[in-house]
Amino acid sequence: MREIVHLQTGQCGNQIGAAFWQNISGEHGLDSNGVYNGTSELQLERMSVYFNEASGNKYVPRAVLVDLEPGTMDAVRAGPFGQLFRPDNFVFGQSGAGNNWAKGHYTEGAELVDQVLDVVRREAEGCDCLQGFQITHSLGGGTGAGMGTLLISKIREEFPDRMMATFSVVPSPKVSDTVVEPYNATLSVHQLVENSDETFCIDNEALYDICMRTLKLSNPSYGDLNHLVSAVMSGVTTCLRFPGQLNSDLRKLAVNMVPFPRLHFFMVGFAPLTSRGAHSFRAVSVPELTQQMFDPKNMMAASDFRNGRYLTCSAIFRGKVAMKDVEDQMRNVLNKNSSYFVEWIPNNVQTALCSIPPRGLKMSFTFVGNSTAIQELFKRVGEQFTAMFRRKAFLHWYTGEGMDEMEFTEAESNMNDLVSEYQQYQDAGVDEEEEEYEDDAPLEEEV
């Protein structure tokens, strides 16, 4: 089967990753030790996408857990699903990266990277037909951002034809951990533009907003945020894990979603978002879910798609729904919001359907959109980057690890290029696109 190797790096990556594994273990009927006690054949049918089968009906996640300090790893190991993972797959250093991208990418991380690649290689060799890799990390820290991008580029070298999907937590202005986040994020985006095939952008600020506004939680914990992220990750990967009428895998998703190779940063959303106590009081219908899904308040990245246009988007339905209902509703939404979709990509909305709903819900809807509005997110980080870099603030932490100022300048201009590429396609109309082709066409000679 089409296996995926999962990597989680840094504190954020490991916590999101742990929530993800907890979530999908439940969906596949595994208990906290990985022993199968589910009821449905469908849970077993494609178990091998994410799990290796060990002896005694036990399943082990195909996950590699990486960090430069032991703290988070110990927390994962001591957590409810700590016994699930293979002990050899925990790879950690002792020193920590101290939120310094250069430490993760060039010094501390570079020392550990070969150990990690050995584990990745071992997992990949055990696969029947490896589909690709997915990595969870944050872009604001040292290990997830610096070492995470180092791993991505090393894996890219070794497996150039496999898919690379990343779930990247982008630093947000209101919820900031450290002052150097803009540096780390810009340097990471510089790497992701070149080396990742699809990047799902998740934003702490948007997650907090969802928790406060929609879920009515007065002070959300990171556990609540991770719970939201794991719902989206589970949704995006549904089609791979369960049989359905319209299955898409990572590659199909990329083919349908990425019109130009550099523009592979997606916004994700999930519906129904109801607080944990409220969902037993109301039924959800396909129209309601579709409405919710296109609501900016449901997006997990803090940029409003109404300020941009969708190049492409993909909707993944889960539950017992008729394909016709879904198609009708999607058409309905498209007709109402046609101004938010570019006209020069016809049929730019793809729908996939899986008949198995997530735990505790009748049906759910995961949304992945490639919108030009994501440039707001990069602009925001870029402005903060420029403000600090102009004064060369905090730069000695990076140059001390052997980085050059030139690298910062390159990363900055690459990110600015990305923003202007998004802007260019946002403004492009059908006529302009056609004119470009007409200019290229050879003139017919008069006879």
UniProtKB/Swiss-Prot annotation:
Keywords from UniProt, A to Z, are: Cytoplasm, Cytoskeleton, GTP-binding, Magnesium, Metal-binding, Microtubule, Nucleotide-binding
In this chain, Mg(2+) is annotated as bound at E69
Query: Is Magnesium among this UniProt entry's keywords?
Result: yes
Picking any one GO molecular function of the record gives:
structural constituent of cytoskeleton
Renumbered to this chain, region (Disordered) spans 426-447
Bias (Acidic residues): 429-447
Q: Which GO terms describe its cellular component?
A: cytoplasm; microtubule
Annotated GO biological processes are: microtubule-based process
Its main subcellular localisation, reduced to a broad class, is: cytoplasm
Gene3D superfamilies attached here?
A: Helix hairpin bin, Tubulin/FtsZ, C-terminal domain, Tubulin/FtsZ, GTPase domain
Highest taxon above the source species: Eukaryota
Its cofactor is:
Mg(2+)
Where GTP binds, per the record, is at: Q11, E69, S138, G142, T143, G144, N204, N226
Q: SUPFAM superfamilies under this entry?
A: Tubulin C-terminal domain-like, Tubulin nucleotide-binding domain-like
Protein's UniProt keywords contain Nucleotide-binding? yes
Q: Which InterPro entries match?
A: Beta-tubulin_BS, Beta_tubulin, Tub_FtsZ_C, Tubulin, Tubulin/FtsZ-like_C, Tubulin/FtsZ_2-layer-sand-dom, Tubulin/FtsZ_GTPase_sf, Tubulin_C
| Role according to the record | Tubulin is the major constituent of microtubules, a cylinder consisting of laterally associated linear protofilaments composed of alpha- and beta-tubulin heterodimers. Microtubules grow by the addition of GTP-tubulin dimers to the microtubule end, where a stabilizing cap forms. Below the cap, tubulin dimers are in GDP-bound state, owing to GTPase activity of alpha-tubulin.
Tell me the PANTHER family matching this sequence.
Answer: TUBULIN
Tell me, how does this one assemble?
Answer: Dimer of alpha and beta chains. A typical microtubule is a hollow water-filled tube with an outer diameter of 25 nm and an inner diameter of 15 nM. Alpha-beta heterodimers associate head-to-tail to form protofilaments running lengthwise along the microtubule wall with the beta-tubulin subunit facing the microtubule plus end conferring a structural polarity. Microtubules usually have 13 protofilaments but different protofilament numbers can be found in some organisms and specialized cells.
Family classification: Belongs to the tubulin family.
- Protein name, entry field: Tubulin beta-2 chain
Q: Corresponding gene?
A: TUB2
